[in-house]
Every structure is written in structure tokens, then in C-alpha cells.
Amino acid sequence: MKSNIKICASWQKKHEQPVYTLADTCPKCNSVTKNTAPAPFDPTDAYGEYRRALKQRVRE
């Protein structure tokens, strides 16, 4: 699922805090915005098995 909320791509350089918007450009500095959604799940993740095993051990 893709998020409609976008963030200013250069907010660290131009703003004190993140600027969120629905537009394709930042309303404050007119720079390009990017999607705020996390990276998609990758089933070929080489370390996924180890991460899941560690998470399960922590739960027990």
C-alpha cells in the first residue's frame, strides 16, 4: 500500500523539522517531495531468517 503523505526530500538542509505534504513539491521551499512509506518486504533478504529468530528468542 502506497502512502499519499510525502516529505520534503531536503528538509534536513532547509528546515528545522520535517515538512509533510500531499503535493509533489514542498510548500515552503518548492523542492521535490518523496514518499514516507517504508521499504517493501524483500523475501530474498539474506539476514531475515536471523532477525526473525532473534526476535522470537527475545519474545520467549
From Swiss-Prot:
Keyword field contains rRNA processing: yes
GO MF, one annotated term: snoRNA binding
Pfam families (alphabetical): Nop10p
GO cellular component: ribonucleoprotein complex
GO biological process: pseudouridine synthesis; rRNA processing
Keywords of the record: Ribonucleoprotein, Ribosome biogenesis, rRNA processing
Keyword Repeat: no
Task of the protein: Involved in ribosome biogenesis; more specifically in 18S rRNA pseudouridylation and in cleavage of pre-rRNA.
Family: Belongs to the NOP10 family.
Protein name: Ribosome biogenesis protein Nop10
